[in-house]
Amino acid sequence: MSLCERRYRPFGQPFDTKLNTVLTDRITPRRRVKIAGSHWIYSLKIIDILKETRPISFEFFPPRTAEGIPAVLETLHGLRAYCPDFVSVTYGAGGSTRSFTEEITFQAKRTAGVEVMAHLTCVGQTKEEIHEVLERLEAEGVENIIALRGDPPRGSTEFVPTPGGFQHATDLLRHIKSNFKFGVAAACYPEGHTESVDLDTDLKYVKQKVDNGADFLVTQLFYDNRYFFDFVERARAGGIDVPIIPGVLPVLNSSQVRRFTVLSGSKIPPALDRLLDKYADNDDSARDMGVEYATDQVRELWDSGVPGVHFYVLNRSYSVSRILDNLRLPGHHRED
């Protein structure tokens, strides 16, 4: 067990203030919140974490069935050894998976003692329904939201807002900031959003998110750090002064990366492209290559002074564990 892991209460055990003393004193201001069932939890906004440290964070997604929830929580539990400053949970595309998003978010807060950033999108819900989701999150002591428009339905290239719903992430941001006290993040795209006509127009939309209350930004995946560094430079020149956290997706297999980069509009550098071809039929070797590639990528980002790193873990712990073992970042490695 690492020193940082001792800051968390035992997985699945009731809240114990003594076990949280170190965590509570580490960063201020932290708010003690009473939630359903007479439980008390400690919460804080991620923007306050960013004022004190350079956070490492992990992103999870809800399973398709309720039976998959324990496996997601177990993966989260295993990664606590690396002392994540927060985790995020993506928003289900609809129906029951949305309730699974809330369930994982609440369980991470209650039983794992990890700060959580809940994803919320404009897809498939009216303003009133989204408001009700926000009220439930607030009642459970969740302090942080990442506000997203959401993707068009599979097979469609155009986003069509739900009747009575929000059309843009900025609309959702404005609603959250006007009605709640959440800390709010927004997404940004170092290589430009797939629907933007050019990088300057894309940056204008990012600036609107910040102007409407985004405390910090988290990037879409990228595999060439030059795109990130260029984006940050352009953002600063454009008056965007909030923290910009790079999002990193380690390669798990060749087909996965090619599929994700097509969907996101991210480019595959020639050197990585050759490696993906080399290991196209060997997932284990591709995964090991991905660990080394991401280790080098994150090391360069960290050494450049990024405010933190957000890992897209895809509900798997192996790759990100090895990456962090390689990097041994201060406060984010297991004891030998």
Positions of PLM-derived features:
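N-terminal amphipathic alpha-helix/helix-capping segment at the start of soluble metabolic enzymes
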Residues: 40-58, 65, 174-175, 332-336
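Glycine-rich, positively charged N-terminal anion/phosphate-binding segment
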Residues: 44-46, 69-77, 82, 94-114
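Active-site mouth loops of central-metabolism enzymes
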Residues: 56-71, 117-128, 185-201, 278-292
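Conserved, mostly hydrophobic/aromatic
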Residues: 59, 87, 137, 209, ...
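Active-site beta-loop-alpha junctions enriched in small/polar residues
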Residues: 60-63, 90-94, 119-125, 150-151, ...
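Short, acidic/polar
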Residues: 67-79, 101, 127-134, 198-208, ...
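Active-site-adjacent beta->alpha loops and helix N-cap segments on the catalytic face
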Residues: 68-69, 95-107, 126-132, 152-176, ...
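Active-site pocket-lining/capping segments in soluble small-molecule metabolic enzymes
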Residues: 163-189, 237-291, 296, 326-336
